[in-house]
Curated annotation (Swiss-Prot):
The gene is PAX9. Residues 82-130 are annotated as: RED subdomain. GO terms for cellular component: nucleus. InterPro entries: Homeodomain-like_sf, PAIRED_DNA-bd_dom, Paired_dom, PAX_fam, WH-like_DNA-bd_sf. This is Paired box protein Pax-9. It comes from Callimico goeldii (Goeldi's marmoset). The lineage of its organism: Eukaryota, Metazoa, Chordata, Craniata, Vertebrata.
Length: 341
């Protein structure tokens, strides 16, 4: 009687996946094989797959059985509670013992014989599943017993410790609006940048420390220096241009004379074309000054017709102002020197 449900194989036969072939069909396969019929012809006649026929005939030739299942039955249980207990004892005595050493111990102590001793993989599975958690708990307890008392943690930045301890007054530093308040246990007075800042790496901090230690007065810190910019310095007077009075320059430009045949001079003159100013000689205030009165100029300089190409501001310098005052000073210094000798 064929089953009412199942699948159809490549030969048109019906089989149920996951269930063994019925014993009647198995016996018929063996009988046809003993009659000398080839396995391929048996599979076509009984509409059973080639692999199934070959497997049943091979098992019958090896064991003489046509029944399904493992050949000879399953292996008897070897991981008995007694064996597990001895394995736990070995592991507690020597936590670093290997599975093959436990297997040898079981044979040496007579717990098992060579027929029922567990394999190395079975012992490893027992250690991992049944004894692993207990062994880890025992190691943790023993570690806690032998662990020394916890030492206080090092404070932050212990290499460059702060000179004064953190007090309640220091913790109450006001914070600007919009910035979240720092709790008292975290807030600390800032005296210098941390050890990882650029100022500490470059050695600026040691210089400021020496200054602050040697001087009783308050010295600005490095972070205060960085706040100083160009805006803090007084700006130059708006009426001065390159150190010269703007009013004087405007007057010279306003009353400049027409060119007298010489090429025009721009507003910029290179430094190489200008002669250096002579340094006036030092004259003692207790000596008489014998400069000639002709060294003084009565009129304005821009009213003279003569000019020189050394005018740096697009105006002409009178030729009569050939530094007569400087020449008079030189003459006066020579006369004073001669009189002193």
């Amino acid at each position: 009687m064929e089953p009412a449900f199942g699948e159809v194989n490549q030969l048109g036969g019906v089989f149920v996946n996951g269930r063994p072939l019925p014993n009647a069909i198995r016996l018929r396969i063996v009988e046809l094989a003993q009659l000398g019929i080839r396995p391929c012809d048996i599979s076509r006649q009984l509409r059973v797959s080639h692999g199934c026929v070959s497997k049943i005939l091979a098992r019958y030739n090896e064991t003489g059985s046509i029944l399904p299942g493992a050949i000879g039955g399953s292996k008897p249980r070897v991981t008995t509670p007694t064996v597990v207990k001895h394995i736990r004892t070995y592991k507690q005595r020597d936590p670093g013992i290997f599975a093959w050493e436990i297997r040898d111990r079981l044979l040496a102590d007579g717990v098992c014989d060579k027929y029922n001793v567990p394999s190395v993989s079975s012992i490893s599975r027992i250690l991992r599943n049944k004894i692993g958690n207990l062994a880890q708990q025992g190691h943790y307890d023993s570690y806690k017993q032998h662990q020394p008392a916890p030492q206080p943690a090092l404070p932050y930045n212990h290499i460059y410790s702060y000179p004064n301890p953190i007090t309640a007054a220091a913790a109450k530093v006001p914070t600007p609006p919009g910035v979240p308040a720092i709790p008292g246990s975290v807030a600390m007075p800032r005296t210098w940048p941390s050890s990882h800042s650029v100022t500490d790496i470059l050695g600026i901090r040691s210089i400021t420390d020496q200054v602050s230690d040697s001087s009783p007065y308050h010295s600005p810190k490095v972070e205060e220096w960085s706040s100083l910019g160009r805006n803090n310095f007084p700006a130059a007077a708006p009426h001065a241009v390159n150190g010269l009075e703007k009013g004087t320059l405007e007057q010279e430009t306003k009353y400049s004379q027409a060119p007298n045949g010489l090429p025009a001079v721009g507003s910029f003159v290179s430094a190489s074309s200008m002669a250096p100013y002579p340094t006036p000689a030092q004259v003692s205030p207790y000596m008489t000054y014998s400069a000639a009165p002709s060294g003084y100029v009565a009129g304005h300089g821009w009213q003279h017709a003569g000019s020189t190409p050394l005018s740096p501001h697009n105006c002409d310098i009178p030729a009569s102002l050939a530094f007569k005052g400087m020449q008079a000073v030189r003459e006066g210094s020579h006369s004073v020197t001669a009189s002193a000798l």
